[in-house]
Structure formats: C-alpha cells, structure tokens
Amino acid sequence: AAFEVSSGLTPEIVEKISEEKHDPEWMRIFRLKALETYNKMPVQNWGPSIAGLDMSNIVTYVRPNTEMRGKWSEVPDDIKNPFERLGIPQAERASLAGVGAQYDSEVVYHNVKAEVAAQGVVYTDMESALTGPYAEMVRKHFMKLVPPTDHKFAALHGAVWSGGSFVYVPAG
C-alpha cells in the first residue's frame, strides 16, 4: 500500500484521511461530524449480529500504490486482470456509456463515451468532482439521500468514505 491509516476510528484518523485525500475544509468538517454521529448512535438490531465487531482493530483507509488512469491500457496488469476476467472492458466497449474501476478504496480508471460527454454528461471520480468544477454540486448533494444521521453505518461511511463515482446528467 502507498498509504495506510492506523487501525481504529478516532478524530485523528479521520483527520488523516481527510488530509491524505486533500479534502476541502467543508468535507473535513463533514467527516468529523459524521464520526461524532457514529459514536453516539447505537448499533442497529437489523441484520446479522455484529457484536464482535471491534473498530479499534480495523484499518478504515488504505490507498493502493497506483493512480487513476485515463486509458484502460495504462492500468497496471495486477489491477486490470480481475476486471478482464469479468469481461468489464469488453462490456464497456460494447454497450456502456461509461465505466469506472475501483481498486481497494481508490478509483483507478474512469471513462465515458465521447458522444455521451458531448451531451454534457459528466462521469468522473468523486475526488475530482469534490475539488473541481463540480465541487459546489457535490457539497449541495453529498449524502443527502442517506444522511449520516440515518443509521450508524451511514455515519461510518460519512466519516471514512473513499472513492466512488460522480455522475451529472444535465436536464433534457
């Protein structure tokens, strides 16, 4: 791994994740508030028992030793091979408007077909959207559908999220 936080779930670890990901200040604060919410909420009683889950032994963020690529041919083979076995690149070429590949907690590949992009559709990784021209849109809508206050694990996600895709489809 190129970077890994210590095990556990503390404000210091969440701050380190935010720093490593070059979050804007509002996201750093969002993460810390989500952690506060996580620490205050009880574990849900739906689903299987997770009584033995000990967050002090879990590493919540690991960045692999790679970076995002613009072309599938540039993605390292050890990352690309599982996707090739699943037939994802072929499916992308055949019918998908766009595809992204995430390895561990980082997006390593994103691509959108030119004809879709020409219509104003944006498909990129969350980190680029968070700090680029769509930053205000991300800020306005991030975790609004399932907010950190929804349940304990939504709060956990809000504190330590990484990776993911941003899609914008203009009206019309």
Predicted regions and their residues:
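Glycine-rich and polybasic anion-binding loops at the starts of cofactor/ligand-binding domains
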Residues: 1-172
